[in-house]
C-alpha cells in the first residue's frame, strides 16, 4: 500500500489524481480504465475539497492498495465534518436537468464506474473506499 497526505485544496487536485493514476498503472489497468478511475476519484476528491472543511483547511489522505485479483482499493480519508455521501438518494437522471435535485450526480458516477463504493466514519475520520477490479 502507498499513501499520501496533501492539503485539501483545488490546486492539489492534479497531484492527487496523478497519485491515483500511478496506483492504477501499478495494478495493470488499461489507459481507458485508468481514466474512468480518475473520474470517479476526482468526484470524491472535489467533494472533500469543497465540503469537508467549511471553516478552515484540512488534509486529505489517499491510500492506494494494488491487490492483484482483488483489484485496486483507493481510500480517500479526511478529518472534516461527518458526511456519508452514500446516504444521498440516487439522482433521477431521466428527469430534465431543470427538474433534478441538486447533488448526488457525483456519487452516481462513482457507483457506475467503480465495482464497490463504501463509506465509514472511524473516530474523527471520513473514509470513502473505491474498489475497481
What are these model-predicted stretches?
Residues 1-5, 111-133:
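Flexible, glycine-/charge-rich segments associated with ATP-binding catalytic modules
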Residues 42-47, 112:
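Conserved polar catalytic motif of the HATPase_c/GHKL fold
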Amino acid at each position: 500500500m502507498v499513501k499520501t497526505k496533501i492539503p485539501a485544496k483545488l490546486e492539489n487536485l492534479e497531484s492527487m489524481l496523478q497519485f491515483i493514476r500511478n496506483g492504477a498503472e501499478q495494478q495493470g489497468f488499461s489507459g481507458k480504465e485508468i481514466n474512468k478511475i480518475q473520474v470517479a476519484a476526482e468526484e470524491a476528491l472535489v467533494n472533500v475539497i469543497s465540503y469537508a472543511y467549511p471553516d478552515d483547511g484540512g488534509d486529505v489522505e489517499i491510500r492506494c492498495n494494488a491487490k492483484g485479483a482483488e483489484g485496486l482499493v483507493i481510500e480517500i480519508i479526511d478529518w472534516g465534518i461527518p458526511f456519508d455521501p452514500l446516504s444521498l438518494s440516487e439522482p433521477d437522471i431521466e428527469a430534465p436537468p431543470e427538474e433534478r435535485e441538486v447533488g448526488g450526480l457525483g456519487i452516481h458516477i462513482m457507483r457506475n464506474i467503480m465495482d464497490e463504493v463504501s463509506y465509514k466514519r472511524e473516530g474523527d475520520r471520513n473514509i470513502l473506499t473505491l474498489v475497481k477490479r
